[in-house]
Amino acid sequence: MSVMAGFAILITEAVVAFYKRVHAINFGVYGATMVGKTTLSYQLRTRGEVQQINKRTVGLERASRKVVKFDGDSHTLKSADIGGEAMYWKQWVEDMKSRKVKYIIFMIDHRHLDSTSNLDHQLAWKFLVDTITSNIWPNGKRKKEADYPMAVSIWANKYDIWGDKYPLREGQSIDKHDIYEPFKYGMRQLNDKGIPTFKYIVSAKSDPEMVYKGITTLIKDY
């Protein structure tokens, strides 16, 4: 390899690295209340053990930039913290529409395993899937190709809490865990729309590497 060719490669790599640094990829993080969305937001900013957060997010907060570094790769993403109560679901739509979100993370925990009568996740998931797969926005405006996400991921959070309580059966892979069962139909709906889905387990509060690996996998694989 000539000196000039080597120099050109270095310049190209520098340009790509700079682009990744300044060009933020829009992520949408949604889910029922108290599932860990705010904790995830803190984790993406601080990378480390996140202290207990007792304050609930009210409405839609301003989106902020976060730099994710994992396995020698670096990406800048932008996400907003949004409340999970049903009264704020319309603001999920506002966030998706205004920022043209490219990747969506829908966070769940184990509450539906603890109590089959708890439908917090299922109701929020149905609303989200119906919104994404619809050809029009709630205001009647028809969606464009860029309005659909590149992928939707279900993150089963608090694995450090429920992992031992609800262990995998012998020979069962993590993506077949019962925690994902209520969301299979919605995932098929997204797939039928041409939107890939991705299951992931995470402990947003205590395991930053799981968080950063999940983000990087979404960007690289989808």
What does each model-identified segment do?
Residues 26-49:
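Glycine-rich phosphate-binding P-loop
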Residues 45-78, 86-89:
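Switch I (effector-binding) loop of TRAFAC-class P-loop GTPase G-domains
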Residues 161-222:
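Canonical P-loop GTPase G-domain recognition
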Residues 118-140, 170-186:
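Well-ordered, non-membrane alpha-helical segments in soluble/globular domains
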